[in-house]
Curated annotation (Swiss-Prot):
Specifically dimethylates two adjacent adenosines (A1518 and A1519) in the loop of a conserved hairpin near the 3'-end of 16S rRNA in the 30S particle. May play a critical role in biogenesis of 30S subunits. SMART domains: rADc. PROSITE patterns: RRNA_A_DIMETH (PS01131), SAM_RNA_A_N6_MT (PS51689). Its EC number is 2.1.1.182. S-adenosyl-L-methionine binds at N27, L29, G54, E75, D100, N125. This is Ribosomal RNA small subunit methyltransferase A. GO terms for molecular function: 16S rRNA (adenine(1518)-N(6)/adenine(1519)-N(6))-dimethyltransferase activity; RNA binding. It is an enzyme of class 2 (transferase). Pfam families: RrnaAD. Keywords: Cytoplasm, Methyltransferase, RNA-binding, rRNA processing, S-adenosyl-L-methionine, Transferase. Belongs to the class I-like SAM-binding methyltransferase superfamily. rRNA adenine N(6)-methyltransferase family. RsmA subfamily. Its main location: cytoplasm.
Length: 290
């Protein structure tokens, strides 16, 4: 029987006297069909290494280890380490690292793979409260992970994968899609977790682009401008720009000029701008001396 089988999960938790900690956002998946779908979505085979974040008691790790060359699982909760040693004992291609992924030296850690030159995919069931910081840390980090298949709160998955002119579209959509393609693969109902969370989850598949989707003069400034445009979603782009950059006559003249160069109407809202539009705007703002 699988670790994810509800009776097995309960038995493991009872045997080790494990209690859930809200501070870690722990929700363990107990549906083997969904676990298999995650592995299939990630296209895991013996030609790839996997970094897993938040293995819990090893339900997904079991499926990954059966299919991948190697799995390196990062678990922050000390109490789960002996449980994982028990549940994953039959595998010789799994390393469990008791560390916060945000603090890990991944450049060094991945050298512990037997074949560190294999492509590395990131597969994770991320705690809702820290999904965005972990994702951006890995996407923007020094290691160009080729692919991410991540379970997260459905609302966050919708925001990351959103297109312009939708309610979900915002600076997070732009921050991720600048580097990656992003698509919701399927929805995971809250009922298949122990304990059950308050909302449904989604599996989001992100694949790194060969190069960023647009070329910009200053990446940091580009992301700053995209954030400014969504500070007040109901306000026009002009109102958000003047609120952030200033309302002096000189500044307003520069903003008008930049919008003219970028061929963007000041009366539209940020959600109407595509990533190329934001790139044009950021470069134009630089050009006029903002």
């Amino acid at each position: 029987m699988r670790i994810a089988d509800k009776t097995v999960t309960r038995a493991i938790l009872e045997r080790h006297g494990f209690t859930f900690k809200k501070s870690f956002g722990q929700n363990f998946l107990t549906d083997t069909n969904i676990l298999q779908k995650i592995v299939d979505t990630a296209e895991i085979d013996k030609g790839v290494n996997v970094i897993e974040i938040g293995p819990g008691i090893g339900a997904l790790t079991e499926f990954l280890a059966e299919n991948a060359a190697e799995v390196m699982a990062f678990e922050i909760d000390d109490r789960l380490i002996p449980i994982l040693a028990d549940t994953l004992a039959r595998f010789d291609n799994v390393q469990v690292v008791n560390q916060d992924i945000l603090k890990a030296d991944l450049q060094t850690q991945i050298q512990a793979f037997k074949n560190p030159d294999l492509p590395i995919k990131v597969v994770a069931n991320l705690p809702y409260y820290i999904t965005t910081p972990i994702l951006m840390h890995l996407i923007e980090g020094k290691i160009p992970f080729a692919e991410f298949v991540v379970m997260m709160q459905r609302e966050v998955a919708d925001r990351i994968s959103a297109m312009p002119n939708t309610k979900a579209y915002g600076s997070l959509s732009i921050a991720v899609q600048y580097y990656m393609t992003a698509k919701v693969s399927f929805i995971v109902p809250r009922t298949v977790f122990v304990p059950a969370p308050n909302v449904d989850s989604a599996i989001l598949k992100m694949v790194r682009r060969d190069q960023p989707v647009v070329s910009v003069q200053d990446e940091d400034f580009f992301f700053r401008v995209s954030k400014v445009a969504f500070v007040h979603r109901r306000k026009t782009l002009w109102n958000n720009l003047t609120s952030h950059f200033g309302k002096s006559e000189d500044t307003k003249a520069k903003l008008e000029k930049a919008l003219e160069i970028a061929k963007i109407k000041p009366s539209i809202r940020g959600e109407a701008l595509s990533i190329p539009d934001f790139a044009s705007l950021a470069d134009a703002l630089k050009e006029v001396g903002i």
